[in-house]
Amino acid sequence: MKTLNNTKIIGIDHGYGNMKTANCCFPTGITAYDHEPLFTADMLVYGGRYYLIGEGHKEFAPDKIKDEDYYVLTLAAIAKELKAENLTEAHIVIAAGLPLTWTSGQKADFKAYLMKNSEVEFTYKKGNYHLYIDDVRIYPQGYAAIASFATTLKGVNLIADIGNGTMNTLYMINGKPQQGKMFTEQFGAYQCTLAVREAFMQKTQREINDAIIDEVLITGTANIASADLKIIKSVAAEYVRDIFRRLREHGYDESTMTLYVTGGGGCLVKNFYKFSADRVKFVEDICAAAKGYEYLAEAQVKAEAKG
């Protein structure tokens, strides 16, 4: 969170797997109730309904504004940032993002969705919040994660933002993004999870919990039978090979370009692909995009103030 003229700029990465701000990360899960649920540790109350934040798994949907879920998750994200500074009331500028090739088409609608209430009150974790949403700034995913050092990049670089739902790729030449060389594909890490589920069921006639799959994808291993681990690792390796096949289809050349991998799916490349450390770099910070949105919004607002 950044402060500018008594306004809080809060970057929010509305991921399909996790919601991220500059300082926190929580699952993109939400369950709504008409009556107060039994367990209320992570409960948000808004508009007369009760929401458990982080519960369940929100399925991939290209249109994030089709229901209230991402709006309520946004309120929770803002509350988490404000709580870190012991605030419950503030004027807010939301800095958010959309997949690269969807930004221009969905930008106005997503901004209107997040700004539908210029003033909003809600309760989160028994704390009462009063927000004034002064503005929403929307930026392209992928680029935001490297925005703070983009101008230092030399030569031809490819940015691959591998999220849970989508993979966004963007070419940078001497620090400048190439408008005509950016791509968005529905090929995020969750596609790998689905492939593991299917392969595991076919080979063992058993179901496997997503928590185990996630552990293997993130760390490269898990305390399970070696035969079961082999199935997961085999599918993950094939998924990563497919990532690089797609990158090459978009013109990626490992010998002449540097690849920057961002997003939660970067761990799959680390764990299941043999790469040259000189040619493949990782943006390790899971909150990098949210921080990038804040960086871009602050720079933009300051530039506008100067006229």
Name each model feature, range by range.
Residues 1-159, 176-191, 203, 211-307:
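Nucleotide/phosphate-binding catalytic cleft detector across ATP-hydrolyzing
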Residues 197-203:
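Acidic, metal/cofactor-coordinating or nucleic-acid-engaging core segments within structured domains
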Residues 169-174:
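PRPP/pyrophosphate-binding module of the type I phosphoribosyltransferase fold
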Residues 162-168:
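Ser/Thr-glycine-rich phosphate-binding loops at phosphate-binding pockets of nucleotides
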